[in-house]
Amino acid sequence: MSLHDIFSQELGISKDEAFIMHWTMLAWFWLHWGQYASTVTKKDIGELTGVVQLFYNNPGVQLVWNNSPFAKPALEDDFVNFVEEIITPQNTSN
């Protein structure tokens, strides 16, 4: 079973929708990584922390975050650790 088949089945969406969702989530992850990498002030970190709390706790986002070989494995460890420390433990077991 392909990754997009898994996403499709888990989320109740078509395989085409799963493909689009997967790559859209990756674009957001990379955007957030860029924001993290360019943080300068505590306000920057606070803003990004709020985004991560809301965005990464969505079940579809969690599914991609935890299963895509282009998400956590492709991002810098500092950013992955930053996200992992923020998201709620009950959602990290996907």
Name each model-derived stretch.
Residues 1-94:
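Amphipathic alpha-helical "stem/stalk" segments
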